[in-house]
UniProtKB/Swiss-Prot annotation:
CDD domains: 14-3-3. Gene3D superfamilies: 14-3-3 domain. Pfam families: 14-3-3. Coiled coil: none annotated. InterPro entries: 14-3-3, 14-3-3_CS, 14-3-3_dom_sf, 14-3-3_domain. This is 14-3-3 protein homolog 2. PANTHER family: 14-3-3 PROTEIN (PTHR18860). Belongs to the 14-3-3 family.
Length: 248
């Protein structure tokens, strides 16, 4: 059974331009499942995605999985409060259903990345984007897993983030929004998943400090994105400061 269902699958549409148009319309209508299926269909056709299309794919799945992540957090909190009560079993069943949905979506994205999107022919920027995305979705799996499964997803996330980081440091400027977004998410991974606040702070601070020295050279078309991510890095450093020994 597919992780996400949509009328687009039944329509049999395989025209690249039409699917991109559908994805854009779906985004405006906040129908993110349709948006995700449209972009997945393009990727599975073997077409290399341009920058706009990569962002459409990312936004679609971020919203689809984001709804489940939010539901899982709420249900997990309720389950803890209701432990030992008559509603405990029902709550646990519901929590597992949400967890299954989230897991299927993450595995769907990870399969798409490894089988269709990360190829030898794509450029460095696309490769960094996809490895970052791979790290993100393994991180989302690790959030809801325990034991050996959690260990495997955590290791896979770190490996993907590290591949993206090595490429980004060689290929992208310190103010590039993809490089900054990668540093933001990698630092969150260390803070939330690996419980390594000092490592998280060190990574976030290095990225912020490097970018702030080059802030005047940011291109107009990326200025808004880059400065927004820099602010998020700074916000996290402020939030985490009590647990860090770095000079922030």
């Amino acid at each position: 059974m597919a992780a996400i269902t949509s009328w687009i699958t039944d329509s049999g549409c395989k025209d690249h331009a039409s699917l991109v148009s559908i994805a854009k319309l779906a985004e405006q209508a906040e129908r993110y499942e349709d948006m995700a299926v449209a972009m997945k269909t393009i990727a599975e056709m073997g077409n290399e995605l341009n920058n706009e299309e990569r962002n459409l794919l990312s936004v679609a799945y971020k919203n689809v999985v984001g709804a489940r992540r939010s539901s899982w957090r709420i249900m997990s909190s309720i389950a803890k409060k209701q432990a030992g009560t008559p509603l405990a079993d029902q709550t646990d069943i519901y929590l597992k259903k949400v967890e299954e949905e989230l897991t299927k979506i993450c595995n769907d994205v990870l399969a798409l990345l490894s089988k269709n999107l990360i190829t030898e022919k794509i450029g460095a920027e696309a490769k960094i984007f996809y490895y970052k995305m791979m790290g993100d979705y393994y991180r989302y799996l690790a959030e809801v897993q325990e034991g050996e499964q959690n260990d495997k997803s955590t290791e896979a996330a770190e490996e993907a983030y590290q591949k993206a980081t090595s490429l980004a440091e060689a290929e992208l400027s310190v103010t590039h929004p993809i490089r900054l977004g990668l540093a933001l998410n990698f630092s969150v991974f260390y803070y939330e998943i690996k419980n390594m606040p000092e490592k998280a702070c060190s990574l976030a601070k290095a990225a912020f400090d490097a970018a702030i020295t080059e802030v005047d050279s940011i291109k107009d078309e990326t200025y808004k994105d880059s400065t927004l991510i820099m602010q998020l890095l700074r916000d996290n450093l402020t939030l985490w400061s009590s647990e860090c020994e770095t000079d922030s």
